[in-house]
Regions:
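Conserved helicase motor core of P-loop NTPases
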Residues: 453-615, 625, 732
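Accessory, non-ATPase domains that flank or precede helicase/AAA+ motor cores in DNA-metabolism machines
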Residues: 1-306, 737
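Loop/turn positions that initiate beta-strands
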Residues: 48-50, 591, 619
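Pre-Walker A segment
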Residues: 270-345, 351
Length: 737
């Protein structure tokens, strides 16, 4: 066992501090005059503080001997010069060395107490107004509150960045709130894993059978399964999973579930032969979506008089002749209020949508086009010649901090002006977003939902597009014919082969489709890097920024985590003068391709033409345009939408040189390099391979194991998603409803 070393002294300087995890490198000046390098989780530390550090020596290859902290005692500075160093270090914005010196000269050892408790006394110093005094006091009070909260969390090995979210939600009382019920940390605000909060709560003395623990575990299981696509869970599965999580009896858990139902936190309803348990917001989304969709289906929308003559006019104007199913879809748009249009690549969905748009224009309707992601909306605009926007922006999605939930400007109280709405990439739309869209439609609005039912389902809960099709309650057109021009593309031919359960043709040069067999993961990684850095740019004249690497998984040699690190080194290496920020174990550098990984409704962005808006959404892709000299902020550019991000917001983004196939849904790239190696069984399925192939527009290069690819094509297993939408549509009007 290594000998524990103890050193006591004053923080001389902070060399490095990671805002996300609190990892810090500092210089400690001991009373003997020794300067010791200390490393460890020491959040919110500043020069002048007094530390007692217990740990072990380690030798860093570049920085030499350093003390790795295992235990830590810290106190605020108690000497005037230490107080000056602390105050002038930046702990209180707006107080630099000059102002700090004047404050310490006036108040001496009482300085920190006065700043926190009696900031109005700062007016005793010439040049500090009443307003300035209160501003300094408030900033210092916030700093001290955040410091105490970080110290509290660090005792339970919780990341310091969590303190920012807790303080935003609960203010000065955050510690009291967490002490009263630590299980709140596993809610939507903080998202801490239940096992972590459970360990914390039990160490604080909470009983194993306490109400807080039982209810938190049930909610955690429902939320966890929501994140895996389920709208509800069967009651027996929920109870079994929760009992296993808690190692307790079913009677206690069932009583807690009944209590949650009484408090309206969950809804229990029989769906077919299943007793379904919903989080209340998901139950409301599903039932509302069903009711509003049925109302649209019941409206009298028959404008058959337009159909035959108008479709013929459109064909003449556009210089085309529709295939029978395309004509059927365009005519249906005039006859019914809601239609579904589905088909794979090359089957003419875009041509059909253009025809429906032309039809609605001739009917004099106000038309709105939308898609789930910014890239899908941009592509929809390019293909139709009309403006399209994301569903989120169409509905005016914002974040209500007080209620801690998403809200929409467009609802039944303030509906959209549109008389016809066309939504593309419907397979990506989850039940909550679909419900919000329907709430914003006026009675009588025509609705056209377009997508590819064979692609992966939405990341969010539900299987909306598939449920709508399988209900057989809505007029649906299946485009199956691959047109001659599209048939010339090996990408499209192979995508349809995969969709039929056949392996793609992996032999030879097929023009826009190449396969490079690599059965060793490290060789596959090396090939992917070579393709992106030299072979494709040099031989195919495709710039690296137009190449997207896709992979089924995040983990492993061919996962996004490893590939992004290596691709960043290859395509955007560290160079003198290029700024970068270390965030956790990741480096973000000017020029990096990045992706928004969770919705942020408050981000303010601006375009070059002066257009201003708010909100960045999960899956938005951009690049780092600038990093401030001090590293306190970044400027990000998302396809022309430029937004400032604080360092704390780096938890919302990730590198995007490589993306998972799921994340790439709704996007299309000039060139796709697919790393296809054996992975988790749930990812080695046909839907993942099919979705990956259909992301490539001009060139697809598959690098990987041919046996794994054939296995994926043959495996049509789909993960079951618990959803009641299809059942509700089919049983509308039943007494059980």
């Amino acid at each position: 066992m290594e000998e524990l070393i103890c050193r006591e002294g004053t923080v001389h300087s902070v060399i490095f501090q990671n805002a996300e995890n609190g990892y810090t490198v500092l210089r400690l000046l001991t009373e003997e005059g020794e300067v010791v390098t200390v490393v460890g989780c020491i959040p919110c530390v500043a020069p002048g503080e007094h530390l007692t550090v217990t740990g072990t020596w380690e030798v860093h290859p570049q920085h030499g001997e350093q003390l790795k902290a295992q235990e830590l005692e810290r106190t605020l500075p108690e000497e005037e010069e230490d107080i000056f160093a602390y105050l002038s270090s930046g702990v209180c914005k707006g107080v630099g060395p000059t102002t700090a010196r004047r404050i310490v000269d006036r108040f001496g050892l009482e300085t920190l107490d006065i700043l926190e408790a009696e900031p109005e006394r700062l007016q005793e110093i010439r040049g500090i107004t009443a307003k300035k005094a209160m501003e300094i006091g408030e900033l210092f009070r916030q700093h001290m509150g955040l410091r105490r909260l970080m110290e509290f969390l660090s005792r339970y090995q919780l990341p310091p960045v969590l303190a920012i979210r807790l303080r935003q939600q609960y203010g000065d009382g955050a510690i009291r709130v967490v002490e009263k019920n630590p299980y709140l940390l596993s809610d939507d605000v903080c998202g801490v894993d239940f096992s972590v909060t459970d360990t914390m709560a039990l160490s604080m003395g909470f009983a194993e059978d306490c109400t807080e623990r039982l209810e938190a575990a049930l909610t955690f299981e429902l939320t966890y399964n929501e994140n895996n696509g389920h709208v509800f869970l069967p009651k027996d599965k929920l109870l079994a999973a929760t009992c296993q999580l808690l190692s307790c009896g079913i009677e206690q858990v069932e009583a807690a579930l009944d209590a949650l139902a009484e408090h309206h936190a969950v809804v229990i309803q029989r769906i077919a032969n299943v007793e379904a348990v919903y989080l209340r917001r998901l139950w409301e989304a599903e039932t509302s979506a069903c009711a509003r969709l049925l109302a649209l289906l019941e409206m009298d929308a028959d404008e058959s008089r337009f159909a035959d003559r108008t479709v013929a006019e459109i064909e003449k104007e556009q210089g085309i002749t529709y295939a029978p199913l395309q004509r059927q879809a365009v005519e249906l748009a005039a006859k019914v209020g809601v239609i579904l249009l589905t088909g794979g690549p090359g089957t003419g969905k875009t041509t059909t949508v253009r025809g429906i748009v032309a039809l609605f224009q001739k009917m004099g309707l106000n038309i709105v086009l939308a898609a789930p992601t910014g890239r899908a909306a941009k592509r929809m605009s390019e293909l139709t010649g009309m403006e399209a926007q994301t569903v989120h922006r169409l509905l005016g999605m914002t974040w209500n901090e007080a209620a801690h939930q998403v809200t929409f400007q467009k609802t039944e109280k303030e509906p959209l002006e549109a008389e016809a709405v066309i939504v593309d990439e419907m397979s990506m739309v989850d039940v909550s977003l679909f419900s919000a869209l329907l709430r914003a439609l006026r009675p009588g609005t025509r609705l056209v939902l377009v997508g590819d039912a064979d692609q992966l389902p939405s990341v969010g809960a539900g299987n909306v597009f598939s449920d709508l099709i399988r209900s057989k309650k809505i007029e649906t057109v299946f485009l199956r014919e691959v047109f001659r021009q599209a048939e010339q593309s090996a990408i499209i031919r192979n995508a349809h082969r995969v969709n039929l359960g056949e392996s793609p043709d992996l032999k030879g040069n097929q023009g826009d489709f190449f396969f490079l067999c690599r059965r060793d993961a490290q060789r596959a990684v090396a090939t992917v890097l070579e393709l992106c850095k030299t072979r494709l740019p040099d031989n195919m004249h495709i710039p690296a920024e137009q190449i997207q690497v896709l992979t089924p998984t995040r983990k492993g040699p061919c996962g996004t985590i490893n590939l992004n690190r290596l691709l960043q080194e290859a395509l955007n290496p560290r160079t003198p003068g290029k700024r970068e920020i270390l965030w956790g174990e990741r480096v973000f550098r000017v020029g990096d391709r990045i992706m928004q990984t969770r919705n942020d409704y408050d981000v303010v962005w601006q375009k070059d033409d002066g257009t201003v808006g708010t909100g960045m959404f999960n899956g938005d892709v951009g690049r780092i345009a600038e990093i401030a000299a001090g590293g306190e902020w970044l400027a990000l550019d998302f396809d022309g939408r430029k937004a400032p991000y604080s360092v704390e917001m780096l938890s919302e983004i990730d590198l995007a040189y490589a993306q998972t196939v799921h994340k790439a849904q709704g996007s299309e790239y000039r060139c796709v390099v697919l790393a296809a190696m054996p992975s988790a069984p749930s990812l080695m399925v046909r839907g993942v391979l099919y979705t990956a192939l259909t992301r490539a527009r001009e060139l697809l290069v598959i690098v990987g194991d041919d046996a794994a690819i054939r296995s994926m094509a043959a495996n049509d297993r789909q993960q079951k998603r618990y959803s009641g939408l299809k059942w509700r549509l089919c049983h509308a009007g039943d007494a059980s409803e």
